Regions:
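N-proximal low-complexity "stem/linker" segments adjacent to membrane-targeting elements
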Residues: 1-40
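Cell-envelope/extracellular polymer assembly enzymes that use nucleotide-activated donors
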Residues: 18-20, 47, 196
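Acidic helix N-cap motif at the loop->helix transition within catalytic regions
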Residues: 30-34, 57-66
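Conserved donor nucleotide-binding strand/loop of the catalytic core
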Residues: 46-49, 60-95
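A conserved acidic beta->alpha catalytic loop
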Residues: 52-61, 108
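Acceptor/aglycone-binding surface of glycosyltransferases and processive sugar-polymer synthases
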Residues: 79-95, 100, 112-191, 216-239
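A short, conserved alpha-helix in the catalytic core of glycosyltransferases
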Residues: 180-184, 190-207
Length: 245
């Protein structure tokens, strides 16, 4: 008589993978320091890389003050003029040195308290890329209707073009092994980073792992920067990278 095999849980990697949190910012004078404090309070980042993308509202003054405090794991870089979120992220990637990269927007829409659930699949070795989804049941502030519709269209387009099943392509919480992006040529300068990165990850044959996150979206009156024209650019980006590299 055969005995039932005992279930063996998935073995975690022998050591914890190190984490770089990359924060692109543009005109976030009111939020950059509180966001940095939130990231530091979580205590999971081995280094924090902030890239100021040509801010003109006093953000740089705040960052200079942070630099003067000589926080050893905080590294700040500056663009002389505004180039866009994608360009700021490329700069951040080039200066980050850890095994996992986590993108953290500076606008307080995404909560660093979600880091443990975002990092778990990577630390357990069951994923190379993790997206935090705003549509998997986590607490969230109601989104603008047209923003939600645009997101659904872009996500559906992604799934059709790249044979994927994801729920939130445009999420700001993208976390991944650093080797995923090391040899990736990113052309995006603005919010088209999201579709370009997603397209190139899926074309590598990497399956995206999703986890539920919280979300506290801003209104345009509060400084939200993405516009309806970015949606058309994102759609074109998805179509373009389906056929070219």
């Amino acid at each position: 008589m055969q005995t039932a095999k005992k279930f063996k849980p998935h073995a975690a990697p022998a050591k914890r993978l190190t984490l770089s949190v990359i924060i692109p910012c543009y005109n976030e004078a009111d939020t950059i320091e509180p966001m940095l404090e939130r990231v530091e309070e979580i205590g999971l980042a081995d280094e924090i890389v902030i890239v100021d993308d040509g801010s003109t509202d006093g953000t740089r003054d705040t960052l200079r003050e942070i630099e003067a405090e000589a926080r050893p794991n905080v590294h700040i870089f500056y663009h002389e003029h505004n180039q866009g979120k994608g360009a700021a992220l490329v700069t951040g990637f080039s200066h980050a040195s850890c095994e996992i990269f986590l993108i953290q927007d500076a606008d307080m829409e995404y909560d660093p308290r979600d880091y443990p659930i975002l990092l778990k699949p990577l630390q357990e070795g069951i994923a190379k890329v993790v997206y935090g989804s705003r549509f998997l049941g986590g607490p969230r502030k109601a989104m603008n209707f047209w923003n939600m519709i645009a997101n659904k269209i872009l996500t559906l387009t992604t799934n059709i073009l790249y044979n994927a099943i994801i729920s939130d392509m445009e999420t700001g919480y993208k976390v991944f092994r650093s080797d995923v992006v090391r040899d990736m040529v990113i052309h995006a300068h603005s919010f088209d980073f999201e579709p370009e990165f997603t397209a190139k990850v899926l074309k590598q044959g990497i399956r995206i792992y999703e986890v539920p996150i919280s979300y506290n979206g801003r209104e345009w009156s509060e400084g939200k920067k993405i516009t309806w024209t970015d949606g058309f650019v994102a759609l074109w980006t998805l179509i373009k990278y389906r056929f070219v590299d």
